[in-house]
Amino acid sequence: HTMPGFNDSGAHITNMAFFDANLNSLKLAQRKSLETVSKMVKRLTSEPAAFFGLDVGTLELGDQADITMIDPEVLRAWDDKGGRELIYRDLFEHPQMVSRSDGVVTHTFIRGEKVWQNGDFGEALGKQTLGRALRAA
């Protein structure tokens, strides 16, 4: 038994862009069935949270409600290898390998607050504390 895990998340900014493993997992599941997508969502959310003893990963009443919404048609057409490019980041004064998935993720919510919608940041982002440090139970 294994747990999905390798997501670079931009830590290796020059030469790696493998932070789209979750989207690729959902795309593979999508090819099979809606039931397989449902199982994959569970594998990517509540199962890792339970393994690490975190009170997140589900949408039960009173939960934190971190949600990412994905357009299934855009995901189906998305080419993960075609979206990789090397760009220059002024912030880091360094080139960075990125993997574009424009349009796949349509909305992101942290604690129920919209922080991303179709390429635009939400008003709450950077102005109020939305998330929290997660510590194992």
Indicate residue ranges for each PLM-predicted region:
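Active-site microenvironment of metallo-dependent hydrolases
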Residues: H1-A137
